[in-house]
From Swiss-Prot:
Lineage: Eukaryota, Metazoa, Ecdysozoa, Arthropoda, Hexapoda
Any single GO CC term annotated in Swiss-Prot or TrEMBL for this entry: Cul4-RING E3 ubiquitin ligase complex
Ranges of Basic residues composition bias in the record: 31-44
PANTHER family: DDB1- AND CUL4-ASSOCIATED FACTOR 12, DDB1- AND CUL4-ASSOCIATED FACTOR 12-RELATED
Protein name from the UniProt record: DDB1- and CUL4-associated factor 12 homolog
Length: 459
């Protein structure tokens, strides 16, 4: 059933064979090969114009090849056990096929994460197969270990400006550099950027002087250049190069130190009112920015100059933008998701939500699958090639949707007012791990006045 989806070459333990080491598999393999050869040798009614021939001497497999065949498992459970146990087996996975299979066959189960008194998770990224990092409205940078089920706090970085009023609005963006060498997010002052080294999460630098209001979006252009967008309607270009940074002396205790940097360039985004989200179009070498007044703005990534702005059609409460390599932008707004042609910014399709009052809070592309986080505590999946929501293989009458748990609202007395309307959290962020078989989703109460959180791993 899973042949072609996952492949695990298991190492034999002394004195034992893996469970997949069954001698009859060799005979079954030979029988299939013989049947395929006979089918190819069958003379068609009409002669072929182009014929290929195989070397008959290549039919026999060496003992080493036969041993590898017997040690190879195509079972999904063997793959998952090997991955979660950290075994040295050679593993491969067809991520496009696998992610669709586990979604359409209702195989994902939620593990809710207890965060305590934390207010709203706004951004997240997987660091590895076992660690996911996320930022909150209360300016916490947290790392969750999936295996240990433990949450650790990473210290936020403060700037060098004494007696300078700080902007406190939370961490709204986390981005990893293309080589996964650096992590960029907001600093303790929400109008500054903070960069950490991966995988250790040691501090590298704080970027100050680029913005006057909290940073809402970021995107890496390459391993050195980072762009940030803020509610002050500005975009800033930063260079992250440790060879050009000055690090203070850590003193006798050798405390971790970090540099202070300033932007290479700061641009006021014309016709914009509050930058909400950014993404980088690698194919066209352009930066797309989304503003809360319903415009999409395009910057040339090589010159860092604004080239155009376009008003989005009937777009309210637009908060997220994602780019697909086929030349598509996806913009999430109050009642639907818009697909735009990246060349012309013309609307290709409006994807209406399957549920009424379902505001779009987060969007992302993984392959040809558009994942949408909603204000009703659900994740929806849209196949851009098929032009429809992903359909369940278990129940053909419904589409695939992951319905998240309620999470927590503080104080708990506040929950009483939501019992009649069946309170659910808004999903502000989601991200897949490298195999796309595990999905982190998080958020919190939709009303700004409420304090609470939700976080969970679907696996």
């Amino acid at each position: 059933m899973f042949n072609g989806m996952v492949r695990t070459i298991r190492d034999s333990v002394v004195g034992t064979y893996p469970s997949c080491h069954v001698s009859s598999r060799l005979e079954e393999r030979r029988a299939k090969q013989r049947a395929m050869r006979q089918e190819r040798r069958r003379k068609p009614d009409k002669p072929d114009d182009f014929v290929t021939y195989e070397d008959s001497g290549s039919d026999e497999e060496t003992p080493q090849q036969q041993e590898e065949v017997l040690n190879t498992s195509y079972n999904l459970c063997d793959y998952l056990r090997s991955r979660e146990s950290g075994l040295r087996d050679r593993r491969s996975v067809n991520v496009e096929y696998t992610s669709r299979y586990v979604l359409t066959h209702d195989m994902l189960r939620e593990t809710q994460i207890s965060l305590g008194y934390i207010n709203k998770v706004f951004c997240s990224k997987w660091l590895s197969s076992r660690q996911v990092v996320f930022g909150t409205k209360c300016n916490k940078l947290l790392v969750y270990d999936v295996n240990m089920r433990r949450v650790d706090a990473i210290p936020t970085l403060s700037n060098s400006r004494a007696n300078h009023p700080e902007v406190q609005g939370g961490l709204h963006a986390i981005e990893l550099s293309p080589s996964r060498s650096f992590l960029a997010t907001g600093a303790r002052n929400s109008s500054d950027i903070a960069v950490y080294r991966l995988p250790t999460l040691d501090p590298v630098c704080v970027g100050e002087g680029g913005h006057r209001d909290l940073i809402m979006g970021m995107c890496w252009l390459d391993d050195q250049f980072l762009v940030s967008g803020s509610k002050d309607s500005r975009m800033a270009l930063w260079r992250i190069n440790e060879d050009h940074m000055e690090f203070p002396d850590g003193g006798e205790e050798a405390c971790p130190t970090f540099a202070t940097i300033h932007p290479l360039s700061v641009k006021e985004v014309r016709t914009a009112q509050r930058i909400r989200s950014l993404c980088f179009n690698k194919e066209f070498k352009e930066i797309a920015a989304l503003s809360l007044n319903g415009y999409i703005h395009i910057f040339n990534a090589e010159t860092f100059k604004q080239t155009l702005s376009r008003k989005l059609p009937n777009c309210q409460d637009n908060v997220s933008i994602a780019y697909h390599s086929d030349g598509l932008y996806a913009v999430g707004c109050r009642s639907y998701t818009i697909l735009l042609d990246a060349r012309t910014l013309q609307t290709i399709k409006k994807i209406t939500s399957r549920y009424s009052g379902c505001g779009i809070r987060a969007t992302s592309f993984e392959g040809n699958l558009l994942t949408v986080g909603t204000g009703l505590g659900m994740l929806l999946f849209y196949d851009i090639r098929a032009g429809k929501y992903l359909e369940s293989s278990v129940n053909a009458s419904r589409t695939v949707a992951l319905k998240c748990s309620k999470g927590i609202v503080y104080p708990e007395d506040e929950m009483d007012g939501f019992q009649q309307v069946k309170y659910v959290p808004a999903i502000y962020t989601h991200c897949y791990d490298s195999t796309r078989m595990r999905l982190f989703a998080a958020g919190g109460p939709l009303p700004a006045t409420l304090v609470g959180n939700y976080a969970g791993v679907w696996q």
